[in-house]
Amino acid sequence: MSIYSQLKQILIAKRCGAFALIDPDIKNDGALLETVEKINNSGFDAILVGGSLIQDNNFDTRIEYIKDNTNLPVIIFPGSSKQLSGKADAILFLSLLSGRNPQYLIGEHVESAPVIHSLNLEPIPTGYILLDGGNRSSVEIISNTIPLPMNKVDIILAHALAGQYLGNKFIFLECGSGASNHASATIIESLYSRLNIPIIVGGGITSSASAKLISNAGASFIVVGTHIENGASVEELQEITSSI
């Protein structure tokens, strides 16, 4: 069964799933095993691996290490076309719809597509929408794009619909790692009532209350990353995953 089919099965079994995000940078190597074990015991459905900037050439090695220490699907969440590995189970094939930088609308995709094909890596087309989470994110800086303001719900919806009509399998609302705010319930509800594809929401999710709010608004998957990296306990993470 494809990873995409497995994700759809998760949504049949329960209202909302949870992804754990691992930043596979050298600065996190010392805590990588502890992080993976924590994720394994916290009720997550899959692991996303990727970051805006990786400072060495060991992405493939870290993917293999994560795979060796978990039974969860490992999905690449790429910050660039260089973040590829045949050892992963799938890759979110991201188009940064909220920006107008052609490198992240099609450039990175053209560069990565032949490699993805040669690796026999399952691509999952995903429309990626960067929202203003209250502080300047690494995604904003690296991609040289401006996030959409959260009070412009109609503009966010238009981008999401465009992503759906282009054939994306998911819409990913992103406020950025360590965001002060997560995507609002108003935004999620607006998209949920009009889209026919699942919504992933990441950035600023640090409590069961925020996770439940996002889930109730219509998100299909939440993403927790910085909260894990900052030392959240298994019990705290279980509260989040069980609340949805």
List where the protein language model places each region:
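Glycine/Thr-rich beta-alpha phosphate-binding loop at enzyme active sites
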Residues: 141-188, 228-231, 236
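N-terminal amphipathic alpha-helix/helix-capping segment at the start of soluble metabolic enzymes
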Residues: 1-22, 26, 112-125, 132
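Catalytic cores of alpha/beta
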Residues: 34-35, 76, 80-93, 190-224
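Conserved anion-binding
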Residues: 83-164
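C-terminal helical cap(s) of enzyme catalytic domains, especially alpha/beta-barrels
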Residues: 63-69, 226-244
